[in-house]
Every structure is written in C-alpha cells, then in structure tokens.
Curated annotation (Swiss-Prot):
It is found in: Cytoplasm. It catalyses: tRNA(Gly) + glycine + ATP = glycyl-tRNA(Gly) + AMP + diphosphate. The keyword Oxidoreductase does not apply. It comes from Salmonella dublin (strain CT_02021853). PROSITE patterns: AA_TRNA_LIGASE_II_GLYAB. The gene is glyS. The lineage of its organism: Bacteria, Pseudomonadati, Pseudomonadota, Gammaproteobacteria, Enterobacterales. GO terms for biological process: arginyl-tRNA aminoacylation; glycyl-tRNA aminoacylation. GO terms for molecular function: arginine-tRNA ligase activity; ATP binding; glycine-tRNA ligase activity. Tetramer of two alpha and two beta subunits. This is Glycine--tRNA ligase beta subunit. Signal peptide: none annotated. Pfam families: DALR_1, tRNA_synt_2f.
C-alpha cells in the first residue's frame, strides 16, 4: 500500500495568543484519533501554529484503509426459525442490517450450538474520501470557549478563515471546510515575503513558508529563536533577560517572523519599585525586563517585533515612546501614594464591599487582624507584629498604584510599609499574604507572614461557607480551593502546630452572627480534607492510602502528613498485606456484632493459646506505643505493629471468634476491638488494597 505526506493548513485572522498552543495540540490529538479510529496507517503527526495559521503534517499516510474481512454473528438457529422452518423476525431484522436475506446467510457451528453468520470482504475507503470529514470533525472538537461568525456565512470558528490547504502528496483533496474550498494556496507574512503563493507538494511544508512567506510556522522553533536571541541581546548590554515561560509563550504566539530588539528607558524611573515597572513592561507591553548580575533592574527592555525593518531604530524609538507614559504614571502614583501612610487608607476600606452578607473590606480587615494575632500566638510568632500586619493588610488596595496596576497588590503594601517605618516582618507579610498563589508557588517566608496568609484565607473560607456559597462543579468565584490548599501547604511545609478544628472555630467566631450555615465548621474542615486528597494524589500517593488516613479525620495538617508518610512506608513492609486483610476481617466481624463489648479483655476468660498470645502482645504494644502516638511517631508505631502478623494469623487459624459461650465470645470480640483500636491510632489499615 502506497504512502504519502498529508498537509492541512487553516489560514485565519490573528488567533488568540494565549490559546494558540492548546488549539494546535488539540487539533493534532483530535486528528490523530480520527486516523486511528478509521484504521488509516500513518507516521508522525506534526503540528504547526503561528498567529494566522494552524497546520498538521502527517508522514507516511496510507492512501486508503486496508481491506478487511467482516463477520457478524446472528441469532442461534433455534431462535432464527420457527417450527415450520420459516425465518423469525429476529433473523430477518439481523439479515436486513447486514444487507442480505436470511437464506444468503452462512451457518456457524461451534461446541455451544449453531448460529447464522454473515461474512463479507469490505474494501477500504480511500484517504481522499475520508480526510475532509476527519479534518472538519477535528476542528469542531477544538477547545474554543467563544466562537465567531463572519460575513453573511453561518460558519463559526475561533477567528475568520481565509484559506484551507489540503494536500495528499502533490494532489489537492477537494473539500469545503469552514466554508472555504480547499486549494494549494498559502498566505505568507502580512508585510514581508510573498503575500500568497502555491505549494506543489505537502513535503515542502514548512520550509516553503519560511523561504517564500517569511513565516516560521514551527511554534517551538520560533519560541526557541526568541529565547536565544533575547538572551544574546541581554548579554550584549551586560544583563540577564527575564524570560518567563508564560510571556515567552505569549510572545511566540504573537509573531510570525520574530526580530528581537533592545530599547531603554530613563534611569530616573528606577526609583519606582521594580515590581511596578516590570508589571508595566511584561503585562501591558509584552516586553522582557533586563536585570544585572545582582538581580537589580536595568533601564533597558527587550521586545520582539514581527517585521525585519530596514531601520530598526524607528521601531525601537516607537516602543520607547509607548512605554514612557506608563512608567511616568507609575512614578507619579508612587510619589503621590507616599504622601500618606498606609494606615491613613483604613477609613476608605469601609466603602468597598467584600461580600454583601459578610461586610466591607474594613470588616474583613478587623477579622484578619484578630485572627492573625490568634494564629501568631499558636505558632510562636510575634503577636503584635501579626496584628499590625493584619490591620494594614488591605490598605494598599486603596492606593493609586494598585488601583492602576492591580497585580502589584501586596508588593506595594510592602514598599509603602517600609517607607512608613513599619517592622520588616510586617512589611514582608503584606507582600506574602497572598502566597501561595498557585501550585508550586513560594510560601510565606517568616512566621508573621504565615500567620497573616493563613488568617486571610481562613476568613474567606469561613465566611463563604458560612453563607452557603461553597464551590459547585468548576465554579469557584472566591478561589476557595486555592485558599484551602494554600493553608494546608503552609501548615504542613512549615510544620506549624495548628489544628483545623480550633482554627476554623476561631475564624467562624469572629464573624459573630453574620453566618447562616450552622454546620460551617464541619463543612470547612471536610472541604479542606478533600483538598488533602487532591494534593496527596498529585504527590503520587495511592488513593487507598489517602482513604485510610482520611477515615480517621485528623484535623492537624502536620499530623495528617505524618500519618500519610507512615502508612505509605507501612505498605512497603512484608507484613502489610496480611495485616490489612486481617484488619478488614476484624472490621467486618465487629460490624456484625450486636452484643455490647467489655471495656477490657478479661485474661481469666482466655482459653486458647493463640488468643492468650495475641492478648499478651496487645498489652505490651499498647503500653509501648502510647508515647509514639502522642509524639506523632506513626511510622515507628506501624513498624512495631507489623510484629502482630504472626499472632494475628495464629489467632484466626486456631480460634473460633463466635464461640457458643457468651462470655468467651464477647471477650474474643473485645480482644479484636483492642487490636483494631491500636491500628486506628494511625489509620484505618483495613482500607488498604
């Protein structure tokens, strides 16, 4: 069977830059699935993406499906014919579905009986006939949140479409996709190269587009070129470019022919906090800031043009003129804001609503102040500094700088607090109160900052759950999942002695009578324990390990973590599976017991050697392990408990638990309950698979 290279390119208006990669990857994944489902043999499926095009190139695509033999078994002969030998309705319906009559069917004899059988040789369809619908289906499945319609057409897509190129080798596959008739025409760069040209063979792509159209269609190659050229440009001025992955991706999605240039701004603007300048350069203008080797911002920036100009100085000058007013605004806001102390903004917080039922930002500030102080007392942080940080925590939201450059909240609070002469850990806390902002983000660096960050997040959790607006499905407008995980990460990774029970109760208490959900404390704790499940699954822990610990509902996060590590280690022991099975058996036996058990195991009632030996082991371990449990040394405790495997096995092999004599039966059930209680001090081992 012959094979050829296949090419599809969809030429569009400028595609959304932040979605470009996902669109291209989804297109490739969807089309690959279509090929596989159709049974079309193929080689590598390569995707290309630039601002005005999505393309796929498939190597070694078979020109048709392979022929195949089809067999369809019908009803058994006994059900296929009536007593007179006439075909039944079931047989006739099956035959119609196969496109034959009953008398044309073959018969299949097996050891289990005889059935009607249809056999056929089906010729594979040509790739040319199959591909148009496969491309259309792949495009229809793209993750596009909002579709566009253009002109008088009813066609919808992410952006208007101008060209559709469909080539199998050197042949155009005729089709109408997204309202456009397929052709071999490709459009080049808007301002360079040939605006439009034809491609003779799919193998010429993307090289022909590079040479004639001045477009680097290979997304990764374009991104790598930007990165390398920007690094070289920064090196030439003695600096290091801030090439964050997200901005690199966005810039690579904005240009088809990247030309990296270096510009500068006035040094006087360096008196403004670097974060505000960087926000302007990266967020608004998509520029790459440049730092010296000490990490200090330089008065330069690197940007990427989408054209190779004969006079790049004009482009540089134009970008410098664009950014200057924004930097001047930042300078003005910074100087204006410093004329007031942070504390002077407190009254204005009363004018901003946090949530209609929960009050204003000033109300939230008062709660955070009290809760941060309480947390500081629990974890050994400076209580006065924590309450001060809580009082000032939202004041920077009222400043000109944060109003204009919203992403600078927190960091500007830190700078203004330093200007006001606040304690350094207070100033740092104002910046770090929102950490961690995302998975893998840094945690607050000092105890005061930890207290403030936890207080802010717990106040939100308690309040929103307290009015019954917990997350539903994918909707989480108050980012409660992120807040809960942030609290857990801080407590666990900083090893803080905080209990979710008392922490949540204190956060709820500070709301007074504003909350309407009587179960708010339990709801918040259950929600946070649920975030533990997601966290530990991401860390690679098995679901049953997590369930075993969750069954005990430990509310101290650091304690939860210790139990997780202990159970995970226990699973590696040779005795683990047998003891897990024994615990499951014990759990089932106790669940069926209807008689009240004794408080203690009565030694005088023990008869069999195996139960006497098990009881002896339990007494020894109970006394030995109490300090382990008290200190959270769960891993050591489970290692000791592993020694119970032999006496437990002996017990179940030689002792009848449900003895006829009531005293003996209840004593043995009590013995098993004491065994289970020891393991439950750590986790419910019976849930391990």
């Amino acid at each position: 069977m012959s094979e050829k290279t296949f090419l599809v390119e969809i030429g569009t208006e400028e595609l959304p830059p932040k979605a470009l990669r996902s669109l291209a990857e989804s297109f490739a994944a969807n089309f690959t699935a279509e090929l596989d489902n159709a049974g079309l043999a193929h080689g590598n499926v390569e995707w290309f993406a630039a601002p005005r095009r999505l393309a796929l190139k498939v190597a070694n695509l078979a020109e048709s499906q392979p022929d195949r033999e089809v067999e369809k078994r019908g009803p058994a002969i006994a059900q296929a014919f009536d007593a007179e030998g006439k075909p039944s309705k079931a047989a006739e319906g099956w035959a119609r579905g196969c496109g034959i009559t009953v008398d044309q069917a073959e018969r299949l004899k097996t050891d289990k009986g005889e059935w009607l059988l249809y056999r056929a040789h089906v010729k594979g369809e040509s790739t040319e006939a199959l591909v148009p619908n496969m491309v259309a289906t792949s495009l229809a499945k793209l993750p596009i949140p909002k579709l566009m319609r253009w002109g008088a057409s009813d066609v919808h897509f992410v952006r208007p479409v101008h060209t559709v190129t469909l080539l199998l080798g050197d042949k155009v596959i005729p089709a109408t996709i997204l309202g456009i008739q397929s052709d071999r025409v490709i459009r080049g760069h808007r301002f360079m190269g040939e605006p439009e040209f034809t491609i003779d063979n799919a193998d010429q792509y993307p090289q022909i587009l590079l040479e004639r159209g001045k477009v680097i269609a290979d997304y990764e190659a374009r991104k790598a070129k930007i990165k390398a050229d920007a690094e070289e440009a920064a090196r030439k001025i003695g600096g290091n470019a801030d090439l964050s992955e997200s901005l690199l991706e966005e810039v690579a999605s904005l240009v088809e022919w990247p030309v990296v240039l270096t510009a500068k701004f006035e040094e006087k603007f360096l008196s403004v906090p670097a974060e505000a300048l960087v926000y302007t350069m990266k967020g608004d203008q998509k520029y790459f800031p440049v730092y010296d080797n000490a990490g200090k911002l330089l008065p330069n920036f690197i940007f990427v043009a989408n054209i190779e100009s004969k006079d790049p100085t004009q482009i540089i000058s134009g970008n410098e003129k664009v950014v200057r007013p924004r930097l001047a605004d930042a300078e003005f806001f910074f100087n204006t804001d410093r004329k007031k102390r942070l504390e002077d903004h407190l009254p204005r917080l009363q004018t901003v609503l946090f949530q209609q039922q929960l009050g204003t930002l000033r109300d939230k500030t008062d709660r955070i102040q009290a809760l941060a102080g309480w947390i500081a007392g629990q974890i050994g942080a400076d209580v006065n500094h924590a309450t001060r940080a809580g009082l000032l925590s939202k004041c920077d939201l009222m400043t000109n700088m944060v109003f204009e450059f919203t992403d600078t909240q927190g960091v500007m609070g830190m700078h203004y607090a330093r200007h006001d002469g606040e304690a350094e850990d207070v100033a740092v806390a104002l910046n770090e109160q929102y950490q961690p902002r995302f998975a893998g983000d840094d945690l607050p660096s000092n105890p005061v900052a930890c207290a403030l960050a936890i207080a802010d997040k717990m106040d939100t959790l308690a309040g929103i759950f307290g009015i019954g607006q917990h997350p539903k499905g994918d909707k989480d407008p108050f980012a409660l999942r992120r807040a809960a995980l942030g609290v857990l990460r801080i407590i666990v990774e900083k090893n803080l002695a905080l209990d979710l029970q008392t922490l949540t109760e204190e956060a709820v208490r500070l709301y007074g009578d504003k909350l309407t959900n009587a179960n708010v404390v339990d709801d918040v704790i259950d929600f946070m324990l649920g975030r533990f499940r997601a966290w530990y699954q991401d860390e690679g822990y098995t679901v049953d390990t997590i369930q075993a610990v969750l069954a005990r509902r430990p509310t101290r996060p650091a304690d939860f973590d210790a139990r997780m590590k202990a159970v995970s280690h226990f699973r590696t022991l040779e005795e683990a599976s047998a003891l897990a099975a024994a615990n499951k058996r014990v759990s089932n036996i106790l669940a069926k017991a209807t008689e009240p058990l004794n408080d203690i195991v009565h030694a005088s009632v023990l008869k069999e050697a195996a139960e006497i030996e098990l009881a002896r082991h339990l007494v020894v371990l109970r006394d030995k392990l109490q300090p382990y449990f008290a200190d959270g040394r769960y891993q050591e405790a489970l290692i000791e408990l592993a020694a119970l495997r032999a006496p437990v096995d002996e017990f179940f092999e030689n002792v009848m638990v449900n003895a006829e004599e009531k005293d003996i039966r209840i004593n043995r059930l009590t013995l098993l309950s004491k065994l289970r209680e020891l393991f439950l001090q750590v986790a419910d081992i019976s849930l391990l698979q």
